[in-house]
């Protein structure tokens, strides 16, 4: 059956949830923040997705490497992420983890690698990366 609360605590939990929705989730300021976060995440995702080479997934690493001058943090860190979690870099044997992306044979696997990379970011780091995308 799962966890059950007494009527008293169930009512208290409902009041807290109602407050959260009224004061936080449905607040206009939170909507602006939610839109900002969506922009940050989409911008990072789209920038990295442009580096995928459909004809030759191995070339994707070269494409990431070419981005290092414009986006040193983003390119450097994502390059390392791909290197650690895939089989497409020759010297990755020193990393004993499972190579969850294999040879990154498809665009979908590459997209998942990007999603996993972004999901591991702190809010502060994601904003730093986003600011790097804005610099000329």
Q: Model-predicted segments: where are they?
A:
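Histidine-centered, transition-metal-coordinating active-site segments
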Residues: 1-136
